[in-house]
């Protein structure tokens, strides 16, 4: 009798858990790039990578210009693979802003000296707060910001040939 109660209770618990997980899987992915697009860039205060002085986002991002915000770290292997694409974008009609994410400043400087610095401005994000405000969940992540200061494209993971071409087409 006691075993029968445990079996019935276990079966009911299994069904309950199955229903909860099934319902959870039916919800849209909150991390989907499409859902996080079309929002204005948030206002924030950061530190300049080189001078360590406070910088306001409103002083960096001006209406009328395209910006590519790239969140990177020296310890990030995929960041190395996307770096040649960023170097190529440096000479286009877009301002590249790098956000150095939870990194050792000396290691980050070695990274840039070794691979080149594609950024017109680099901000330090030692605690990861700015990246989270932008909607990033890791590195590398890249955001294309239009002339109205609205995020129009989010790239999760390294920039590749396909995403590079898409960026170039969007800023034409």
Predicted feature residues:
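Thiol-based oxidoreductase modules, predominantly thioredoxin-like and allied folds used
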Residues: 94-107, 119-128
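N-terminal targeting signals for export/organelle localization
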Residues: 1-47
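Hydrophobic beta-strand anchors of alpha/beta hydrolase catalytic cores
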Residues: 68-69, 96, 142
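Conserved redox-active cysteine motifs that mediate thiol-disulfide chemistry
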Residues: 71-88
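Short pre-active-site segment immediately N-terminal to redox-active cysteine/selenocysteine motifs
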Residues: 65-67, 71-75, 138
């Amino acid at each position: 009798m006691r075993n029968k109660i445990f079996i019935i209770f276990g079966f009911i618990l299994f069904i309950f858990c199955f229903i909860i997980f099934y319902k959870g899987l039916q919800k849209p992915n909150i991390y989907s790039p499409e859902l996080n697009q079309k929002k204005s860039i948030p206002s924030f205060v950061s530190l300049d990578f080189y001078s360590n002085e406070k910088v306001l986002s409103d002083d960096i991002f001006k209406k009328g210009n395209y910006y590519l915000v790239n969140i990177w770290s020296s310890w990030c292997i995929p960041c190395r693979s996307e770096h040649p694409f960023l170097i190529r974008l440096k000479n286009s009609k877009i301002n590249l802003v790098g956000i150095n994410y939870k990194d050792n400043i000396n290691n980050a400087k070695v990274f840039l000296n070794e691979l080149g610095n594609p950024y017109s401005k680099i901000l330090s994000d030692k605690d990861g707060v700015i990246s989270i405000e932008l909607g990033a969940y890791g590195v590398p992540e890249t955001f294309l910001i239009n002339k109205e200061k609205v995020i129009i494209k989010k790239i999760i993971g390294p920039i590749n040939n396909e995403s590079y071409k898409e960026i170039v087409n969007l800023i034409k």
